[in-house]
């Protein structure tokens, strides 16, 4: 049977300054300079080196493999001074067979390169390309006869369910390196065996399958594949399986298991304050908990392949996922092979996840208008590749705001979504309504989604009269209030994804008074502060009873009468000022009260069993800390 040992400790890291220090994995060298602005974070080659003793294994009957789950963006791996593999693409798993190269004591060196180049994606985008070994490295010992480890970094097991007339047929294809007999069993959530089959191309059948049914009932089976040699089990792979159907209709939106299922959710970048992309499982768990609290049922995992652990969480909690490769912003004529290899790895490594319904081939690729013919051909090749490798899912892409509805790139994939910031980068929130209606009028048979929309919001910036571009928490909330009403009038949209769930690093930016950051998140970069907009979405999407008073951080006010805005998913909200009830409203999501402001007041909102409190005070002059002080900057703010 296979054994796995992590190689996470005692790495010698030689960084940009040429000095060598001791680090633990996960690690990135851009955790600080990739988040502080200036578009000057260091990109180049750094070296990681460690020693390990050869694992106990029988060379006649076993093999040893190294597994790398994320090295950004190019890796050159050396074992005992010998170059054993290279890998281009910083977000996917790769493995290398090392049995014949091991000594008693071994030196493993990984040269990691995130340099600017013309053939590996991403090269231009509104996020930081952190260099480093930021996911796990493992040493694996397996039988010489084993379930394949050398196929695009996948598990060697491909599971394809088909549902019809209330029954399920499940095809389980197993790649074997060596020889042996394959047996397959399907276990229900309680661990009971509900189906069995034999062979490397096995068929399982269920008469009454329990469906994976989104966030309300994300039921998962477990498929156990065993490889036996001479009657002895020598290898085993377990995979969670969700059984579901889905479809998309341009007039009625997304369907899950045959019924309408409105997809409303968020996009997610994986990085964190102070650690970059070198995040832990506990951080993944916290991200998922916040997304679930919001009430989202879909996640766009942008703009690259995320950690397998997070896809597992999406399976577990019923999130419908858009998965994509980092073919982004600027087409590279020399980069086609890299888009193909990254897509093959994305599909192979994630094929078995029931959460995933579509493969994203690119994002805002028309920002650069050069090499248009080659770019379109690259898209067609990717689209065809996705369909060839996976006939069970759809393809999509995210179009740049300035990519008009008639652009041919928007009509290659099965689905299309737009990144539109009307009301933020462009004046006029009302234009969102017009844009959706126009596209639907011209292309009534084309499913349309919003892959990005949002506005910057700083929890420390405030205004009683918020305006586009002021970066206040209030304008961000005002923007999202409009967008939610807009989507409610366009229920035929196949999916909408807020940009972004969390603030994230973009070292080229200098906006909102904090260089190096994109502040469109509903939650701050450190995950410690839920902005008011977070609670707005919770009011629309969540079933968890709550009430929230907005603008709590906007304490000092100059007006003699102020608005107290309240978000809640309850039908009635009562407001108290200094203990006296001043009003009660019935409605949905957003409740607004006008109250006089003299001196300091204590405000309490009550909705059912839920309460929230806030304090405000009248001041004679505006608090200068609430207003953005704009400075001249050479940083390239993304538009």
Model feature map: region roles:
Residues 171-173, 288-291, 298-540, 544-560, ...:
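Substrate-binding/catalytic cleft of secreted carbohydrate-active enzymes
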Residues 1-305, 311-313, 317-321, 342-348, ...:
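Secreted/periplasmic carbohydrate-active enzymes, especially glycoside hydrolases
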